[in-house]
Amino acid sequence: MAHENVWFSHPRNFGKGSRQCRHCSSHSGLIRKYGLDLCRQCFREKAADIGFNKYR
């Protein structure tokens, strides 16, 4: 088996490796609530466009 066949060949069906940000494909700091699937950095950029308001 060549390196290309081995790399990322393990199935990622659950856990942090199975989910990624829909905007930047990052695996860290993911906000999954309400089906957002955005990392926290992208959420801060896109929150106003989505319709979230900051009251404080």
Swiss-Prot record:
Keywords: Cytoplasm, Ribonucleoprotein, Ribosomal protein, Zinc
Cellular component terms per the entry's GO annotation: cytosolic small ribosomal subunit; yeast-form cell wall
UniProt cross-references to InterPro entries, sorted A to Z: Ribosomal_uS14 (IPR001209), Ribosomal_uS14_CS (IPR018271), RIbosomal_uS14_euk_arc (IPR039744), Ribosomal_uS14_sf (IPR043140)
Binding site for Zn(2+): C21, C24, C39, C42
PROSITE patterns: RIBOSOMAL_S14 (PS00527)
Assembly information from the UniProt record: Component of the small ribosomal subunit. Mature ribosomes consist of a small (40S) and a large (60S) subunit. The 40S subunit contains about 32 different proteins and 1 molecule of RNA (18S). The 60S subunit contains 45 different proteins and 3 molecules of RNA (25S, 5.8S and 5S).
UniProt-recorded Gene Ontology molecular function terms: structural constituent of ribosome; zinc ion binding
Location of the protein in the cell: Cytoplasm
Listed cofactors: Zn(2+)
Paired cysteines (S-S): none
One Pfam entry name: Ribosomal_S14
UniProt keyword Isomerase present: no
Source taxon at top rank: Eukaryota
Function noted in UniProt: Component of the ribosome, a large ribonucleoprotein complex responsible for the synthesis of proteins in the cell. The small ribosomal subunit (SSU) binds messenger RNAs (mRNAs) and translates the encoded message by selecting cognate aminoacyl-transfer RNA (tRNA) molecules. The large subunit (LSU) contains the ribosomal catalytic site termed the peptidyl transferase center (PTC), which catalyzes the formation of peptide bonds, thereby polymerizing the amino acids delivered by tRNAs into a polypeptide chain.
Keyword Ribosomal protein: yes
Protein name: Small ribosomal subunit protein uS14
GO biological process, one term: cytoplasmic translation
Family: Belongs to the universal ribosomal protein uS14 family.
